């Protein structure tokens, strides 16, 4: 594969090879984020697992975490919650939890709950990642279940500068196994361990602007119709999932996608970027409040930092002198206030300043601070609280009922089975 193109976001995400050793040491100690501060990525606990449940409206879900043991399929789902400024990446682009198919294997960088009293998922003992769970081994239920960065395999590889080298393929009846090793793009590790993964007729193969099938590779003589063949360390990016495996193999992952070149993964990233841009424009840009200057008769000037991880064109819409709306939200980014949606009770007014931070910006922050003036401030827009902001040129639409709060009850924040109608 030629040099993989990377977006501007990598400058924020990639902290440099020199930090790797320090990151490992720092990550050994559980870290709890502080209110009003973006936590350092190098202090996050790293793990990976299969997405098995999603509550997209509350930005939480469950992963089957890969532990030190060999019986992966026995590992119980482990709940996680996205931090308000937490970033989701899918196929090399910004994403929402709703964009990621169940079964996708994801890489996690997580922390302890910032405030255990308001956690949207169970709060576990601080040392829980060191506990052994039978044959599953250690690490399947870490207490660091509040996520700063959640990314699929292709996004992870692009961020850290790695690729998969395909060693050999074994094929029979349009399904089989591939042996591959994960390598650095810049240097080859001859001692890198190989991993065997399965594929089948549903595996998507992308080359340039084409989507190929296994039969296409057979017809071109690249893969055998049956049997084994060396792939000569072909460099690719992979999408990885998990499926039940025959032959009493307890832990073996499955290939959902193979991107054969830069063009293929760049097209996937562009498509996902457009999906996410449309989503954010309808749900508004998340931010947190740095300061509030109160004026007379309910007027106020709010200083807020926009959260990071979005496409640059979204931030470009925040311009000095343009109009905007600001609404208070939960730590789940679910809109509060309003009987029929976020615009009902939102503060209105002009954006009077936009300031971009020079230098390194922590993951989770955009490095962009806005000042917003309103003649009627609402409860919930206070320093340290999370808000969503809509520039005046974004469409005003009504979000679905499950994505905003009409009351402040715990039942509405986290619905129980009682929400179902009684027929």
Label the model's feature ranges.
Residues 1-13:
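Bacterial N-terminal signal peptides that target proteins for export
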Residues 21-85, 90-423:
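Short, flexible, surface-exposed loop segments at domain boundaries
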Residues 10-22:
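Bacterial N-terminal signal peptides
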Residues 6-8, 17, 338:
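Intrinsic structural disorder/low-complexity segments
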């Amino acid at each position: 594969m030629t040099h993989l193109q990377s977006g501007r976001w990598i400058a924020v995400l990639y902290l440099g090879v020199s930090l790797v050793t320090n990151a490992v040491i720092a990550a050994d100690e559980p870290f709890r984020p502080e209110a009003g501060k973006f936590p350092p990525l190098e202090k996050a606990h790293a793990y990976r697992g299969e997405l098995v449940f999603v509550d997209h409206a509350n930005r939480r879900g469950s992963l089957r975490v890969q532990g030190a043991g060999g019986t992966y399929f026995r590992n119980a789902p482990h709940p996680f919650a996205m931090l308000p400024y937490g970033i989701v990446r899918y196929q090399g682009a910004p994403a929402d939890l709703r964009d990621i198919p169940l079964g996708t294997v994801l890489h996690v960088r997580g922390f302890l709950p910032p405030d255990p009293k308001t956690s949207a998922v169970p709060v576990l003992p601080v040392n829980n990642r060191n506990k052994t769970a039978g044959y599953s081994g250690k690490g399947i239920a870490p207490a660091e279940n509040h996520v700063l960065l959640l990314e699929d395999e292709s996004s992870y590889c692009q961020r850290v500068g790695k690729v998969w080298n395909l060693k050999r393929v074994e094929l029979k009846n349009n399904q089989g196994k591939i042996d591959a090793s994960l390598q650095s793009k810049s240097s080859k590790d001859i001692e890198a361990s190989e991993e065997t993964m399965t594929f089948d007729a549903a595996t998507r193969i992308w080359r340039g602007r084409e989507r190929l099938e296994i039969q296409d590779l057979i017809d071109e003589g690249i893969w055998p119709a049956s049997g084994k063949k060396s792939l000569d360390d072909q460099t690719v990016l992979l999408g990885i999932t998990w499926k039940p495996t025959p032959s009493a193999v307890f832990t073996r992952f499955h290939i959902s996608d193979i991107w054969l070149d830069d063009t293929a993964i760049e097209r996937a990233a562009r498509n996902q970027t457009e999906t996410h841009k449309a989503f954010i424009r309808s749900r508004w840009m998340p931010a947190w409040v740095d300061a509030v200057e109160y004026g007379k008769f309910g007027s106020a000037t709010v200083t807020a930092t926009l959260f990071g991880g979005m496409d640059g064109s979204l931030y470009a819409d925040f311009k000095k002198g343009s109009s905007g709306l600001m609404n208070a939200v939960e730590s789940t980014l679910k809109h509060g206030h309003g009987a029929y949606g976020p615009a009902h009770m939102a503060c209105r007014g002009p954006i009077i300043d936009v300031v971009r931070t020079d230098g390194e910006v922590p993951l989770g922050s955009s490095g962009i601070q806005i000042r917003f003036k309103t003649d009627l401030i609402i409860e919930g827009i206070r320093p340290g609280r999370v808000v969503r902001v809509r520039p005046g040129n974004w469409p005003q639409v009504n979000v679905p009922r499950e994505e905003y709060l009409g009351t402040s009850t715990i039942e509405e924040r986290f619905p129980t089975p009682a929400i179902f109608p009684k027929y």
